[in-house]
């Protein structure tokens, strides 16, 4: 074989390795940015900094959520919320409630104390 036209296998492997590392690093930075963005929201930070009351959260849940999710979160029109805190992070639950991105669930942004109470109640289901 002619050494001038045959690429050195070590150089090819090194180039591919560098490309893979660069892609993985870019993905890691993207995911880190997404994670930080979720926690940067002042509303989310305020809710997470507030101590919730599960009793008040139950009342808020029954008034606003119980019709679709069942009075005890066992699901009716909306999905069951039993063990929801094991399936979703606190931030994901807050964003699910306030976003309105899952029709037919309406957008709902209670004040931070009420959201902290609701979150505390959901953690008991």
Tell me what each language-model feature is:
Residues 55-63, 86-91:
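Sequence context surrounding c-type heme c attachment/ligation sites in exported
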Residues 10-16:
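N-terminal membrane topogenic signal
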Residues 72, 76, 82-125:
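Extracytoplasmic electron-transfer domains, predominantly the class I c-type cytochrome c fold
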Residues 16-32:
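Hydrophobic membrane-insertion alpha-helices, especially the h-region
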Residues 57, 61-71, 118-122:
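The canonical Cys-X-X-Cys-His
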Residues 1-9:
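N-terminal Lys/Arg-rich, disordered targeting/topogenic segments
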Residues 34-60:
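Electrostatic cytochrome c docking/interface patches
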